Design a protein with these regions (language model features):
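Class I SAM-dependent methyltransferase SAM/SAH-binding core
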Residues: 1-35
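Short alpha-helix immediately C-terminal to the canonical SAM-binding loop
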Residues: 13-14, 54, 77
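A short acidic, Gly/Pro-enriched loop at the edge of an enzyme's catalytic core
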Residues: 33-45
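Residues lining the SAM
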Residues: 43, 48-51, 70
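Conserved class I S-adenosyl-L-methionine
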Residues: 58, 66-99
Length: 128
């Protein structure tokens, strides 16, 4: 495979691997702080909502490679928070400096998602 993906949750990795019918991705259970790839092996690293492990990210991305990351916006999962908390709160969003990387562009992304069935329970279980 030309792509590798990992998550700390074995359940998330199993679910994603089941959906990968073409086996285009090599899936693994791993922490952001111990990425199972060689030094300077990645042309691009994409981090979605995981803890920032800047030193590890810099280790695996090739010189001149890209690091793309997504952080929760101010109203990320706000609907869940309205149900779960007496006083829902907005997230604080700030640009973060990652040693070894330069911020190229910041692109806000907004979308609404409706969840149903057992996915609702999963979403509540992972919401801080």
């Amino acid at each position: 495979p030309s792509a590798a993906a990992f998550d700390i949750s074995k359940f998330a990795v199993k679910a994603a691997a089941r959906r990968d019918k073409g086996h285009a991705v090599q899936w693994a259970v791993a922490s952001s702080f111990a990425i199972p790839v060689a030094d300077a092996a990645a042309d691009c690293l994409v981090d979605i909502f995981s803890p920032a492990a800047a030193q590890e990210f810099a280790r695996v991305v090739k010189p001149g490679g890209a690091f793309v990351f997504a952080v929760p916006g101010p109203r990320h999962l706000y609907g869940v928070k309205e149900v779960r908390y007496e006083r829902p709160y907005e997230n604080t969003v700030q640009d973060v400096a990652y040693p070894g990387f330069a911020l190229g562009q910041r692109i806000p992304v907004h979308s609404m998602l409706t969840v149903t069935g057992s996915t609702i329970l999963d979403l509540f279980a992972m919401t801080p």
